[in-house]
Amino acid sequence: MDPKMVNLLNKALHDEHLAIAQYLHHYNQVRSKFTDVVDHFKEHMGDEQDHAKQLADRIYALRGKPTSTIEGFAEFTEDLDTALQQDVKAEAGAIELYSKILDYAEEVDDKATIMMLEAILDQERGHQDEFLKMLAESQK
């Protein structure tokens, strides 16, 4: 087992759990007011659930134990712009963390983790772009 890799993947798993909770909250808070964006929150929540499952599966494959502690929720809001800003920030943090883990995976030549992280990173970048576009639209 590579304890450093397991710790890094557990940090990412923790953050995915936070993202799921954040997107669920945003979905529930804005769905009656902003029906045009609510499906994006729901879709991204599903993507983050998939990421969490992939991370947990990889941690088990590395003979580690997935974390179940969740701390650090964003302040809950009913304001769409604030919600989108929180989501842009969360995606930026995810991109930064996944890039760091990818660098380490490449350093230790962990091909399975590299493939998983490259796919997740592509989705996270897409999420960030989408949230940035929605934020720009909401501020017009």
Model feature map: region roles:
Residues M1-K140:
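Iron-associated oxidoreductase/ferritin-like identity signal
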